[in-house]
Amino acid sequence: MIKQALLSVSDKTGIVEFARELNALGVTLLSTGGTAKLLADSGLPVTEVADYTGFPEMLDGRVKTLHPKVHGGILARRDLPEHMAALAEHDIPTIDLLVVNLYPFQQTVAKDDCTLPDAIENIDIGGPTMLRSAAKNHRDVTVIVDPVDYAVVLDEMRANGNKVGYDTNFRLATKVFAHTAQYDGAITNYLTSLGADKSHQARSAYPQTLNLAFEKVQEMRYGENPHQSAAFYRDLKAVDGALANYVQLQGKELSYNNIADADAAWECVKSFAVTTPACVIIKHANPCGVAVGANALEAYDKAFKTDSTSAFGGIIAFNVELDETAAQAVAKQFVEVLIAPSFSAAARAVFASKQNVRLLEIPLGKGINQYDLKRVGGGLLVQSPDAKNVQPTELRVVTRRHPTPKEMDDLMFAWRVAKFVKSNAIVFCGGGMTLGVGAGQMSRVDSARIASIKAQNAGLTLAGSAVASDAFFPFRDGLDVVVDAGATCVIQPGGSMRDDEVIAAADDRGIAMVLTGTRHFRH
């Protein structure tokens, strides 16, 4: 039974209301510093921990709760007579409920003007110590680290005579250990990112020890293949607009491959301006059709035409609300997952009878993940995300013929798509749509040939098309393939030892070529 609670929080959201309800239930309130003042100013009966222990706060508040009367009251096992006898001998009441959240270390070090002393002073000592004590003794002590749990605890107390069940206490304890682990991980990340001069401004993006925190969203029936087990975890630092923030409106549980392909589709479609409706169709993590249009329907129709065969059973993403008209067109095809920032009520009604179709709603966001991660045997490759979008002013025309305004638009579109195609990538585009995509080949020439064949199979002409290559042409052979297919302009990074030969070949063939200076390998 909860008779006495200790409340000491940095995040004071809802703490007064929570304490008021505890007081109404007859719970004695202990508190520290600013929390105690807030509760007292709110008219609540509260005892300062310094008065409770008979020992004053000291060292500028560094020592407040590190006292046997606090930790003894938390750690004592109520089912062990010797523990309870020790409490009685030393006149230590039990503390049955602990509410603590920690100094805002991560928010502090996120500030540009943070100094090492600022960071050090925001490393909480007493808070984690109390939290770990309470979480260890969770059979007897309820511990709250997150204001979202106030209501749950109050409901159980009201329903059970001030008692909280073991299952709830266990869940709250595991939440505490996850929280303190993340907190210590953030401290380690920061301190090991500092250079020899310990300058906050000169710290490395890649700390000597890297701690990452994820929480499980779901376990899956299987992984990439049926013989593999799998689960999906969400990054606790997931940015706005990340796939992990999806809300599933309908459909079966997402599979491992669904999520992998959905991420590829969403990242690609997000790269287009929201003022330009765009549609991306993904199969096996590669775009098989990408287009922009006057509306969602036009964008979808154009994207689907690129490769209607591969689009079967694909993942489709839009960067604008999916309306009824576009939904009706999409519903005619077999689609695994459909993603959009929002779905109109009429669009949702279209899919109501197709419960196997998974509808994911994800708000568009401008945030960029801190890291791009790739697991290798015994290690982890960590890099910054490939977030660079080349602007037309950054392009360098290297041929005698310059692209026309229409060709430049097509080149920019093709370059945007090529970034999301597995290397080696060759993408034919024209009129705001992909015409042929060659992906994942060991030879750039083969990717060019496949892209040309794809367009031919789809009945799409490549005459006057634009081509993007995710990396440089090492020889002129790949260039000749795309020009023979009908391309009149090419965009590529440049940087080959034979750039001069490739540029000369472009001049020989009478096409325009622009260099980006940026490569978009994707493995």
Curated annotation (Swiss-Prot):
InterPro entries from the xrefs? AICAR_Tfase_dup_dom_sf, Cytidine_deaminase-like, MGS-like_dom, MGS-like_dom_sf, PurH-like
From the UniProt record, list the reaction(s) this protein catalyses: (6R)-10-formyltetrahydrofolate + 5-amino-1-(5-phospho-beta-D-ribosyl)imidazole-4-carboxamide = 5-formamido-1-(5-phospho-D-ribosyl)imidazole-4-carboxamide + (6S)-5,6,7,8-tetrahydrofolate; IMP + H2O = 5-formamido-1-(5-phospho-D-ribosyl)imidazole-4-carboxamide
Q: Which residues form the MGS-like domain?
A: 1-145
Mention one GO molecular function.
Answer: IMP cyclohydrolase activity
**What keywords sit in the KW lines?**
Hydrolase, Multifunctional enzyme, Purine biosynthesis, Transferase
Cellular component aspect of the GO annotation: cytosol
- Name which cysteines form disulfide bonds: none
Pathway per the UniProt entry:
Purine metabolism; IMP biosynthesis via de novo pathway; 5-formamido-1-(5-phospho-D-ribosyl)imidazole-4-carboxamide from 5-amino-1-(5-phospho-D-ribosyl)imidazole-4-carboxamide (10-formyl THF route): step 1/1; Purine metabolism; IMP biosynthesis via de novo pathway; IMP from 5-formamido-1-(5-phospho-D-ribosyl)imidazole-4-carboxamide: step 1/1
One GO BP = 'de novo' IMP biosynthetic process
Q: Where are the transmembrane segments?
A: none
Its Enzyme Commission number(s) read: 2.1.2.3, 3.5.4.10
Annotated family: Belongs to the PurH family.
Show the domain comment: The IMP cyclohydrolase activity resides in the N-terminal region.
PANTHER family named in the record: BIFUNCTIONAL PURINE BIOSYNTHESIS PROTEIN ATIC (PTHR11692:SF0), BIFUNCTIONAL PURINE BIOSYNTHESIS PROTEIN PURH (PTHR11692)
Q: What is this protein called?
A: Bifunctional purine biosynthesis protein PurH
Gene behind this chain? purH
